[in-house]
Regions:
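A penicillin-recognizing enzyme superfamily signal
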Residues: 1-68, 77, 83-91, 102, ...
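Short coil/loop residues immediately preceding or within conserved phosphate-binding loops
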Residues: 59-61, 151, 193
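Active-site rim segments in enzyme catalytic domains, especially the processed small/beta chain
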Residues: 89, 93-133, 267, 341
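Short, solvent-exposed beta-strand edge segments and adjacent coil->beta transition regions
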Residues: 93, 163-165, 193-195
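Conserved catalytic neighborhood of penicillin-recognizing serine enzymes
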Residues: 116-177, 221, 233-258, 262
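Mid-domain, small-residue-enriched loop/turn segments at the edges of structured enzyme/sensor domains
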Residues: 136-141, 172-210, 219, 223-226
């Protein structure tokens, strides 16, 4: 608890007054009257400052950010539960493992470099990848369906299958995926290792929302803009802010990935958006869950809004016991869904529920994998 103690205003004030470590510890272990956070209303109580630090450890934190695809304007931003008690921005500064929300970047590179399509089939078997030191990395897989069968990329992403992501990473390279992530606005340090395909990198929610926003922006990364302009008291514009833009991928790949990620919502890990929250308009997205169920993610996209949610405790050692509740579909997706319900119900926003527009080139790709595979079987027969 020492690091948390040193980060408090109380500790810094005592240190500035010349207290030594022993004196500071004595103050922190002496009960005093204080007001602490609770989900209903703040509670007036008596406890030691050290006990209050331990008390706050058990609260889940969450962050949310939403932005417009083409303008980059940030429309909603929640850095934590209550800034009076949790003075840390979980959106901009908290870099956490991203889990399966990183998989779309791997799929994007596989489509760009290797020509994969949503209905391309890969055998669902455990891949083995030789590492630089000669050891073998063979990832585990929580998904036990269709082992040994041929599965489509659309199915694999919808069900967040680890083996297929690792198979794709084996065909491309970690560095090529990192290069793509950089074009999509990710600046956090990333190690070029095969396990990157499962989301071992630690990245902020702000970066991830900005990166996902590339897909509904026709492959163009648009830097998130928090302030559009600055005016003086007379209304004179002192500064205008225009987002930086980078062509991260071609429009056709972006559209293909959007449609592939719609499968996550229509019949994969995010299907509860439809049946539990009645969000039946076109939505593409991806859940993410990290080791020991410490972090839950969901990033969802519509043609007019990209929003992401992260949920977890301040320290990874505090987490859910099992994946029953310790997964992105339970930890983060409900927040996203309730937020979007409010957006659609607000007449002042008047958010349309249109489908994602097709590329201007007229490009289209088949997403009805059952029909495509039937046609393939007939041709072979």
């Amino acid at each position: 608890y020492e690091r948390s103690q040193r980060n408090t205003d109380r500790y810094r004030a005592l240190q500035a007054e010349g207290y030594n470590k022993q004196q500071i510890d004595s103050v922190f272990n002496t009960p005093v009257r204080m007001r602490v956070f609770s989900w209903n209303n703040p509670i007036d109580t008596i406890m030691s400052p050290m006990d209050s630090i331990k008390y706050y450890y058990w609260f889940l934190r969450s962050g949310l950010m939403a932005m417009e695809p083409h303008t980059g304007y940030v429309k909603a931003y929640v850095g934590g539960p209550d800034y009076r008690y949790f003075k840390y921005d979980q959106v901009k500064y908290a870099a956490r493992q991203v889990g399966s929300t990183f998989k779309p970047f791997v799929y994007t590179m596989a489509m760009q470099e290797k020509g994969y399509k949503p209905c391309s089939e890969i055998p669902k078997i455990q891949p083995s990848i030789e590492l630089w030191d000669g050891s073998i990395w063979a990832p585990a897989n929580a998904n036990k369906d269709k082992i040994g069968e041929m599965v489509t990329l659309k199915w694999a992403l919808a069900n967040s299958d680890n083996w297929i992501s690792a198979h794709l990473m084996k065909e491309i390279s970690p560095q090529s995926v990192i290069d793509l992530a950089r074009k999509m606005g990710v600046t956090s340090p990333i190690d070029p290792v095969p396990s990157l395909c499962l989301g071992t990198a630690e990245i902020t929610l702000c970066e991830m929302v900005g990166a996902f926003n590339t897909y509904p922006s026709q492959g163009v990364y648009v830097e998130p803009i928090f302030v559009s302009r600055i005016e003086d008291k007379y209304g004179n514009v002192l500064e205008n802010f225009v987002p930086n833009r980078t062509q991260a991928m071609n429009e056709e790949t972006a559209y293909t990935m959007l449609r592939t990620m719609q499968g996550v919502v229509e019949g994969g890990t995010s299907v509860r958006l439809q049946y539990r929250y009645n969000l039946r308009n076109p939505i593409a997205g991806k859940t993410g869950t990290t080791q020991n169920h410490s972090d839950g993610w969901f990033i969802g996209m519509t043609p007019y809004l990209t929003a992401g949610v992260w949920t977890g405790a301040e320290f990874r050692s505090i987490h859910f016991r099992s994946i029953t509740y310790g997964q992105g579909a339970h930890m983060a997706l409900p927040i996203w869904a309730l937020f979007m319900q409010k957006v659609y119900d607000d007449p002042t926003i008047n958010m349309p529920k249109d489908d994602f527009p097709k590329p201007m080139s007229g490009y289209d790709v088949n997403f009805d994998c059952s029909q495509e595979n039937l046609n393939k079987w007939i041709e072979e027969f």
